[in-house]
From Swiss-Prot:
Keywords: DNA-binding, Sigma factor, Transcription, Transcription regulation, Virulence. Residues 49-119 are annotated as: Sigma-70 factor domain-2. The sigma-70 factor domain-2 mediates sequence-specific interaction with the -10 element in promoter DNA, and plays an important role in melting the double-stranded DNA and the formation of the transcription bubble. The sigma-70 factor domain-2 mediates interaction with the RNA polymerase subunits RpoB and RpoC. The sigma-70 factor domain-4 contains a helix-turn-helix (H-T-H) motif that mediates interaction with the -35 element in promoter DNA. The domain also mediates interaction with the RNA polymerase subunit RpoA. Interactions between sigma-70 factor domain-4 and anti-sigma factors prevents interaction of sigma factors with the RNA polymerase catalytic core. Disruption phenotype: Not essential for growth in culture. Upon disruption about 260 genes show significantly decreased expression while about 200 showed increased expression. BALB/c mice infected with the disruption mutant showed a moderate but significant decrease in virulence, surviving about 30% longer than wild-type. The lineage of its organism: Bacteria, Bacillati, Actinomycetota, Actinomycetes, Mycobacteriales. One of its GO terms (biological process) is DNA-templated transcription initiation. Interacts transiently with the RNA polymerase catalytic core formed by RpoA, RpoB, RpoC and RpoZ (2 alpha, 1 beta, 1 beta' and 1 omega subunit) to form the RNA polymerase holoenzyme that can initiate transcription. Interacts (via sigma-70 factor domain 4) with RsdA. Induction: Positively autoregulates, probably directly, expressed at a relatively high level throughout exponential growth and during stationary phase. Expression decreases during O(2) depletion (hypoxia) and after heat shock (5-fold, 45 degrees Celsius). Extracytoplasmic function sigma factors (ECF) are held in an inactive form by an anti-sigma factor until released by regulated intramembrane proteolysis (RIP). RIP occurs when an extracytoplasmic signal triggers a concerted proteolytic cascade to transmit information and elicit cellular responses. The membrane-spanning anti-sigma factor is first cut extracytoplasmically (site-1 protease, S1P), then within the membrane itself (site-2 protease, S2P), while cytoplasmic proteases finish degrading the regulatory protein, liberating SigD. Residues 152-201 are annotated as: Sigma-70 factor domain-4. This is ECF RNA polymerase sigma factor SigD. Belongs to the sigma-70 factor family. ECF subfamily. Transmembrane segments: none annotated.
Protein backbone atom coordinates (compact mmCIF):
# COMPACT_ATOMS: atom_id res chain seq x y z
CA UNK A 1 0.00 0.00 0.00
CA UNK A 2 1.35 3.43 -0.98
CA UNK A 3 1.03 6.41 1.36
CA UNK A 4 -1.25 9.15 -0.03
CA UNK A 5 1.44 11.70 0.69
CA UNK A 6 4.05 10.01 -1.46
CA UNK A 7 4.36 11.71 -4.81
CA UNK A 8 4.49 9.64 -8.03
CA UNK A 9 7.94 8.37 -8.93
CA UNK A 10 9.16 8.33 -5.34
CA UNK A 11 10.17 5.26 -3.39
CA UNK A 12 9.22 4.63 0.22
CA UNK A 13 10.17 2.09 2.88
CA UNK A 14 7.84 -0.43 4.49
CA UNK A 15 8.62 -2.86 7.28
CA UNK A 16 9.30 -6.41 6.19
CA UNK A 17 6.74 -9.01 7.16
CA UNK A 18 7.17 -12.76 7.53
CA UNK A 19 5.03 -14.83 5.18
CA UNK A 20 5.17 -18.56 5.95
CA UNK A 21 2.84 -19.59 3.12
CA UNK A 22 5.62 -20.14 0.60
CA UNK A 23 7.59 -22.36 2.98
CA UNK A 24 4.46 -24.40 3.69
CA UNK A 25 3.88 -24.67 -0.06
CA UNK A 26 7.45 -25.87 -0.54
CA UNK A 27 6.99 -28.54 2.12
CA UNK A 28 3.77 -29.73 0.47
CA UNK A 29 5.53 -29.73 -2.90
CA UNK A 30 8.31 -31.96 -1.58
CA UNK A 31 5.70 -34.47 -0.41
CA UNK A 32 3.63 -34.50 -3.59
CA UNK A 33 6.72 -34.73 -5.83
CA UNK A 34 7.50 -38.13 -4.33
CA UNK A 35 4.01 -39.29 -5.30
CA UNK A 36 4.40 -37.86 -8.80
CA UNK A 37 7.75 -39.62 -9.27
CA UNK A 38 5.99 -42.85 -8.27
CA UNK A 39 3.54 -42.35 -11.14
CA UNK A 40 0.55 -40.69 -9.46
CA UNK A 41 -1.05 -38.58 -12.23
CA UNK A 42 -3.06 -36.46 -9.79
CA UNK A 43 0.15 -35.67 -7.93
CA UNK A 44 1.83 -34.79 -11.23
CA UNK A 45 -1.00 -32.37 -11.98
CA UNK A 46 -0.63 -30.79 -8.54
CA UNK A 47 3.12 -30.40 -9.05
CA UNK A 48 2.54 -28.57 -12.33
CA UNK A 49 -0.17 -26.34 -10.86
CA UNK A 50 2.10 -25.48 -7.93
CA UNK A 51 5.31 -24.74 -9.80
CA UNK A 52 3.83 -22.77 -12.69
CA UNK A 53 3.12 -19.49 -10.81
CA UNK A 54 6.50 -19.77 -9.07
CA UNK A 55 8.29 -20.23 -12.38
CA UNK A 56 6.35 -17.42 -14.06
CA UNK A 57 7.28 -14.96 -11.28
CA UNK A 58 10.93 -15.93 -11.53
CA UNK A 59 11.07 -15.72 -15.33
CA UNK A 60 9.28 -12.39 -15.42
CA UNK A 61 11.73 -11.00 -12.89
CA UNK A 62 14.74 -12.27 -14.85
CA UNK A 63 13.45 -11.79 -18.39
CA UNK A 64 10.63 -9.24 -18.24
CA UNK A 65 7.03 -9.47 -19.36
CA UNK A 66 7.46 -7.95 -22.81
CA UNK A 67 8.89 -10.00 -25.64
CA UNK A 68 12.19 -8.66 -26.95
CA UNK A 69 13.96 -10.19 -29.93
CA UNK A 70 11.98 -13.38 -29.53
CA UNK A 71 12.56 -13.50 -25.77
CA UNK A 72 9.32 -14.00 -23.83
CA UNK A 73 9.21 -14.66 -20.10
CA UNK A 74 6.04 -16.72 -20.37
CA UNK A 75 7.56 -18.83 -23.15
CA UNK A 76 10.64 -19.45 -21.02
CA UNK A 77 8.40 -20.33 -18.06
CA UNK A 78 6.58 -22.87 -20.21
CA UNK A 79 9.90 -24.43 -21.21
CA UNK A 80 10.94 -24.61 -17.56
CA UNK A 81 7.71 -26.35 -16.56
CA UNK A 82 7.99 -28.81 -19.44
CA UNK A 83 11.63 -29.58 -18.65
CA UNK A 84 10.79 -30.06 -14.97
CA UNK A 85 7.92 -32.45 -15.63
CA UNK A 86 10.05 -34.34 -18.17
CA UNK A 87 12.85 -34.68 -15.61
CA UNK A 88 10.57 -35.86 -12.79
CA UNK A 89 10.91 -39.62 -13.46
CA UNK A 90 14.68 -39.26 -12.97
CA UNK A 91 14.41 -36.98 -9.93
CA UNK A 92 15.89 -38.30 -6.69
CA UNK A 93 15.47 -36.64 -3.30
CA UNK A 94 19.01 -35.94 -2.07
CA UNK A 95 18.00 -33.90 0.95
CA UNK A 96 17.54 -30.60 -0.90
CA UNK A 97 14.14 -28.92 -1.40
CA UNK A 98 12.51 -29.64 -4.75
CA UNK A 99 12.36 -25.87 -5.24
CA UNK A 100 16.17 -25.90 -5.45
CA UNK A 101 15.96 -28.48 -8.24
CA UNK A 102 13.33 -26.32 -9.95
CA UNK A 103 15.50 -23.21 -9.60
CA UNK A 104 18.42 -24.99 -11.26
CA UNK A 105 16.29 -25.77 -14.32
CA UNK A 106 14.80 -22.27 -14.40
CA UNK A 107 18.19 -20.53 -14.13
CA UNK A 108 19.55 -22.73 -16.92
CA UNK A 109 16.60 -21.97 -19.22
CA UNK A 110 16.81 -18.24 -18.52
CA UNK A 111 20.53 -18.28 -19.34
CA UNK A 112 19.79 -20.16 -22.57
CA UNK A 113 17.16 -17.57 -23.48
CA UNK A 114 19.55 -14.68 -22.92
CA UNK A 115 22.26 -16.35 -24.97
CA UNK A 116 19.76 -16.90 -27.76
CA UNK A 117 18.81 -13.23 -27.58
CA UNK A 118 22.45 -12.18 -27.68
CA UNK A 119 22.39 -10.75 -24.20
CA UNK A 120 24.80 -11.47 -21.35
CA UNK A 121 22.65 -10.17 -18.53
CA UNK A 122 19.03 -10.32 -17.43
CA UNK A 123 16.52 -7.77 -18.70
CA UNK A 124 15.01 -5.68 -15.92
CA UNK A 125 11.57 -6.69 -14.76
CA UNK A 126 8.52 -4.71 -15.86
CA UNK A 127 6.56 -5.85 -12.83
CA UNK A 128 7.54 -6.08 -9.19
CA UNK A 129 5.38 -7.01 -6.20
CA UNK A 130 3.69 -4.24 -4.24
CA UNK A 131 4.78 -5.82 -0.96
CA UNK A 132 8.12 -7.43 -0.24
CA UNK A 133 8.42 -10.01 2.53
CA UNK A 134 11.42 -11.47 4.30
CA UNK A 135 12.72 -12.11 7.81
CA UNK A 136 11.78 -9.46 10.32
CA UNK A 137 14.52 -7.19 11.61
CA UNK A 138 14.81 -3.53 12.63
CA UNK A 139 17.44 -2.78 9.99
CA UNK A 140 15.82 -4.82 7.24
CA UNK A 141 13.35 -2.89 5.17
CA UNK A 142 11.56 -3.39 1.88
CA UNK A 143 11.15 -0.85 -0.85
CA UNK A 144 7.98 -0.10 -2.71
CA UNK A 145 8.21 1.82 -5.95
CA UNK A 146 5.60 3.79 -7.86
CA UNK A 147 8.18 4.07 -10.62
CA UNK A 148 9.03 0.60 -11.93
CA UNK A 149 11.81 2.09 -14.02
CA UNK A 150 13.43 3.51 -10.90
CA UNK A 151 13.23 0.15 -9.13
CA UNK A 152 14.81 -1.58 -12.12
CA UNK A 153 17.67 0.89 -11.99
CA UNK A 154 18.11 0.19 -8.28
CA UNK A 155 18.22 -3.57 -8.79
CA UNK A 156 20.80 -3.17 -11.54
CA UNK A 157 23.31 -1.59 -9.14
CA UNK A 158 23.44 -4.78 -7.07
CA UNK A 159 26.01 -7.53 -7.64
CA UNK A 160 24.52 -10.44 -9.59
CA UNK A 161 24.31 -12.83 -6.63
CA UNK A 162 22.67 -10.28 -4.34
CA UNK A 163 20.15 -9.45 -7.06
CA UNK A 164 19.43 -13.16 -7.59
CA UNK A 165 18.91 -13.70 -3.86
CA UNK A 166 16.51 -10.76 -3.65
CA UNK A 167 14.53 -12.10 -6.61
CA UNK A 168 14.24 -15.55 -5.02
CA UNK A 169 13.37 -14.16 -1.59
CA UNK A 170 11.12 -11.28 -2.62
CA UNK A 171 9.62 -12.05 -6.02
CA UNK A 172 9.49 -15.85 -5.90
CA UNK A 173 8.95 -15.95 -2.14
CA UNK A 174 11.41 -18.66 -1.14
CA UNK A 175 12.48 -18.96 2.49
CA UNK A 176 16.09 -18.23 3.42
CA UNK A 177 16.68 -21.98 3.71
CA UNK A 178 15.19 -22.69 0.27
CA UNK A 179 17.13 -19.83 -1.29
CA UNK A 180 20.37 -21.10 0.24
CA UNK A 181 19.75 -24.57 -1.19
CA UNK A 182 18.92 -23.06 -4.57
CA UNK A 183 22.04 -20.91 -4.92
CA UNK A 184 24.41 -23.31 -3.17
CA UNK A 185 25.00 -21.14 -0.12
CA UNK A 186 24.13 -21.13 3.57
CA UNK A 187 21.09 -19.67 5.27
CA UNK A 188 23.28 -17.20 7.14
CA UNK A 189 25.03 -16.07 3.96
CA UNK A 190 21.68 -15.58 2.24
CA UNK A 191 20.41 -13.40 5.07
CA UNK A 192 23.63 -11.37 5.08
CA UNK A 193 23.50 -10.89 1.30
CA UNK A 194 19.84 -9.91 1.47
CA UNK A 195 20.48 -7.41 4.27
CA UNK A 196 23.43 -5.87 2.40
CA UNK A 197 21.40 -5.63 -0.79
CA UNK A 198 18.49 -3.92 0.95
CA UNK A 199 20.85 -1.59 2.81
CA UNK A 200 22.57 -0.63 -0.44
CA UNK A 201 19.23 0.11 -2.07
CA UNK A 202 18.20 2.17 0.96
CA UNK A 203 21.46 4.14 0.87
CA UNK A 204 21.04 4.77 -2.85
CA UNK A 205 17.50 6.05 -2.39
CA UNK A 206 18.47 8.32 0.51
CA UNK A 207 21.48 9.68 -1.40
CA UNK A 208 19.29 10.44 -4.41
CA UNK A 209 16.58 12.02 -2.28
CA UNK A 210 14.12 9.64 -3.95
CA UNK A 211 11.82 9.21 -0.97
CA UNK A 212 9.11 11.02 0.91
Amino acid sequence: MVDPGVSPGCVRFVTLEISPSMTMQGERLDAVVAEAVAGDRNALREVLETIRPIVVRYCRARVGTVERSGLSADDVAQEVCLATITALPRYRDRGRPFLAFLYGIAAHKVADAHRAAGRDRAYPAETLPERWSADAGPEQMAIEADSVTRMNELLEILPAKQREILILRVVVGLSAEETAAAVGSTTGAVRVAQHRALQRLKDEIVAAGDYA
